[in-house]
Amino acid sequence: MPDERGAIFTRREVVEFILDLVGYTEDRDLAQTKLLEPSAGHADFLLPIIGRLVRSYVAHGGDLTRGAQTLGPAIRAYEVHESSLETARSVVVAELLRLGVKKAAADGLGRTWLVRADFLMAPLPHTFDFVVGNPPYVRQELIPAVLLARYRARFKTLYDRADLYIPFYERCLDVLAPGGRLGFICTDRWTKNKYGGPLRAMVSEEFSLTHFVDLVDTQAFLSNVMTYPAITVIERPKPKSKARPTRVAYRPAISAEVFGPLAKAMTGTKLNHKAGVVEMSGVVNGSEPWILHQADRLALVRRLEETLPTLEEAGCKVGIGVATGNDGVYIGDMKTLNVEPSRKLPLARTQDLRGGSIDWQGKGVLNPFEEDGQVVDLASYPKFAAYLQEHAIQIKARHVAKKNPERWFRTIDRIYPALAKTPKLLVPDIKGDAHIVYEEGKLYPHHNLYFITANEWDLRALQAVLMSGVARLFVGTYSTTMRGGFLRFQAQYLRRIRVPHWKNVPKPLQKALREAAVAGDREAANRATYQLYGLNEAERDIVATV
């Protein structure tokens, strides 16, 4: 996992591969170029960069014994943490000495190249021909409020719940010279999710996505991380340059033996299909999610999107369960929560979903809302009031309580009691396959469960559709993938699923779908769903391999 600074350390062979993709190669006179590393860490990127720079300098006639200090403008690296900066500086100087640079020049370059500063706020001296790195992965809640406000004022891409790596992209893209290239290894979340929209739009308007390498299920870092990385290479095109397709590679083995030929294939004049590289046009399209799957899969998704309504257009509702802000206080055993009956609801949690059905463990959640959506008058519920008072310190410490001091006991999300009594489908966030459970209308969903209700569709029949490979096709096209091949079955991705209106489903097929769901028969669900969508054999094969 990232350390407390958001740092994740990158394997040497991955760094070398990124440098090859952006064109930072020794055949060029690298001393005449300018490279930026925005988050130096312990110099994972800088050491290979320095090796290439020095060897290129010598190959192009440079004299290390006299002219090494002329390399000063070639690199600029930033690091905000002093201990990391000192570590990076010491290994940089040691590497320069190993390469034949004299001590005084090596010390001078270490000071010139490495700058201690907050990269997002530091003044930058000029534009750069290359930007490479592994930007820090820090969630907003870990950034001090005053600093976060300054970042928000400065960076248009710091939108919604965007993590810190997003403004790193923006700042680095802003300082790319014409023809310059950025090569980052980073989580791929921003390429598909909501908060990545403004950054995707920025790339679409001003830049070109030249290369994308999907690193799902690979060991690109020196420690295990949950969210899967990808390499993105983005170029600021020179004036009047022609648009080019994106070259894409999928899940290469992490080794120099693989990366060397792959880099040549990805950067060569002609496309070498045998190397596992594909070209895709139209990947970048305004703020729309990037779809980087094979063309036949994309064509199937587009066909279904053009001919069928979304789940919600077909009369279904997709939502997420309640977040309380302190589950230890708001959730307890339903029988022993000492509050009035109307002030608690039986709760469905991920732990209650077993083997495709509900095995309720008896937990309940406090309900501070009346049916009309107003918070309750505590004077009318003395037991509830006493319970809240007993836990007032923890309750008032929540962010939502500080924002709403008069309604300090409300949950983060409003609770709609009628939802507990409504039949629904429950979907855990992270699953390898669509793990859809029917709940007959007795439980309220917890915040790690998504729910689907339906006005038109028979929920059991809809369960069969969502159990099928077609659901995974849609969600997998738009969702980020987690370790082990798990997909995020979140509301924003569930809403992408297309289904016909229930009235347009033939009666025999309605029956077949329902029976498949009740039996928990995934194969039968697939057969009926293939018929529902009119998939031909080739399209069925695509769905089967998702």
From Swiss-Prot:
InterPro entries per record: DNA_methylase_N6_adenine_CS, MethylTrfase_TaqI-like_dom, N4_N6_ade-DNA_methylase, SAM-dependent_MTases_sf, TaqI_C
Entry's transmembrane regions: none
Q: Which domain of life is it from?
A: Bacteria
Q: GO MF terms on file?
A: DNA binding; site-specific DNA-methyltransferase (adenine-specific) activity
Write out the catalysed reaction.
a 2'-deoxyadenosine in DNA + S-adenosyl-L-methionine = an N(6)-methyl-2'-deoxyadenosine in DNA + S-adenosyl-L-homocysteine + H(+)
EC category: transferase
Q: What is its EC number?
A: 2.1.1.72
Q: Which family does it belong to?
A: Belongs to the N(4)/N(6)-methyltransferase family.
This chain belongs to the protein called Type II methyltransferase M.XhoI
Specify the species. Xanthomonas vasicola
